[in-house]
């Protein structure tokens, strides 16, 4: 209701219902983004809908439970991306490629270690949050987490595409990835159920990452080094291998989790020190 009131106020002040000048500028930018968002919806939801249709409610319920736990990584990615984008646009405009890649390396390292930590913790988290009949979803969670990690990596390219205002190609890359997802679900779900849907999710998000990086490279001026991707993917691949090898060895897994935790603290030590100094300084002034 408040928004509707604002709309009428703005329209009254504008004194013009339609401005062809702004429509010509906005529509070519906005319409492809609608297709991009719809493709993202298909990519994120089609596996559960198709799994329910092909394998029944029980299989879909277990997979949805696994996906919900894995989506914690999506929340982390969304929060960090909101902080990254303004800084990235500002430094891209200033042509600060070196500074961008230096920070991107730290960003990817921290997110990769965080991804590995979430992967390794999933068996215990799953047992705390879900009933015993859902515990079989553990390996599915790791697969979906790996897929969401590629969704994180794809944002480096898509952020540049938005910066270049070439939204037509954004839609093309996302539509292709959504088509890959639907096709793989049709192929894998009847044979492998929830695990098939998880594999389809991983491959589809990888395809999304590849498509958008090809597009960003073709636009020219894309300033993220490809070596940083290999750096991050290698770390998460090791984490994915470790969770599959140590799934039934919780003590060993938690030793690795603690080591990762110390690693995160070590790489963030300067930030932690600065925050502690600010807190202590603030405490003294009070």
Q: What does each of the following model-derived ranges do?
A:
Residues 25-29, 33, 51-71, 135-139:
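Interfacial/gating helices of multi-pass transporter permease domains
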Residues 1-2, 168, 175-210, 244-258:
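Membrane-interface helix-loop junctions in multi-pass transport and translocation proteins
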Residues 2-6, 77-80, 101-151, 182-191:
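Alpha-helical transmembrane segments of multi-pass membrane transport and lipid-handling proteins
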Residues 14, 145-176, 216-218:
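Membrane-interface junctions at transmembrane-helix termini in multi-pass inner-membrane proteins
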Residues 243-286:
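Membrane-proximal transmembrane or re-entrant/amphipathic helices at the cytosolic face
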Residues 3-44, 83, 87-98, 220-232, ...:
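Interhelical loop/hinge segments that connect adjacent transmembrane helices in multipass membrane
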Residues 48-49, 59-77, 105-106, 147, ...:
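Alpha-helical transmembrane segments of polytopic membrane transporters and translocases
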Residues 70-105, 158-163:
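Helix-loop junctions and terminal segments of transmembrane helices
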């Amino acid at each position: 209701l408040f928004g509707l009131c604002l709309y009428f106020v703005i329209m009254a002040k504008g004194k013009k219902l339609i401005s062809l000048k702004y429509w010509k500028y906005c529509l070519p930018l906005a319409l492809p983004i609608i297709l991009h968002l719809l493709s993202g919806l298909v990519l994120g939801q089609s596996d559960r809908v198709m799994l329910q249709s092909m394998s029944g409610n029980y299989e879909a319920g277990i997979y949805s439970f696994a996906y919900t736990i894995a989506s914690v990584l999506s929340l982390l990615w969304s929060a960090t991306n909101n902080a990254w984008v303004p800084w990235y646009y500002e430094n891209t405009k200033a042509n600060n490629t070196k500074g961008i890649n230096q920070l991107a390396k730290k960003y990817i390292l921290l997110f990769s270690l965080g991804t590995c930590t979430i992967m390794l913790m999933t068996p215990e988290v799953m047992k705390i949050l879900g009933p015993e009949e859902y515990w079989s979803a553990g390996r599915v969670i790791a697969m979906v987490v790996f897929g969401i990690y590629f969704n994180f990596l794809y944002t480096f390219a898509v952020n540049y595409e938005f910066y270049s205002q070439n939204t037509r190609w954004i839609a093309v890359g996302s539509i292709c990835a959504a088509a890959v997802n639907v096709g793989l679900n049709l192929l894998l779900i009847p044979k492998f159920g929830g695990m098939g849907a998880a594999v389809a999710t991983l491959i589809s998000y990888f395809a999304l990452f590849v498509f958008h990086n090809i597009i960003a490279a073709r636009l020219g001026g894309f300033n993220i080094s490809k070596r940083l991707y290999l750096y991050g993917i290698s770390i998460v691949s090791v984490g994915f291998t470790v969770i599959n090898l140590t799934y039934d060895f919780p003590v060993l897994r938690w030793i690795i989790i603690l080591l990762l935790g110390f690693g995160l603290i070590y790489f963030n030590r300067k930030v932690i020190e600065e925050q502690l100094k600010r807190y202590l300084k603030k405490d003294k002034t009070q």
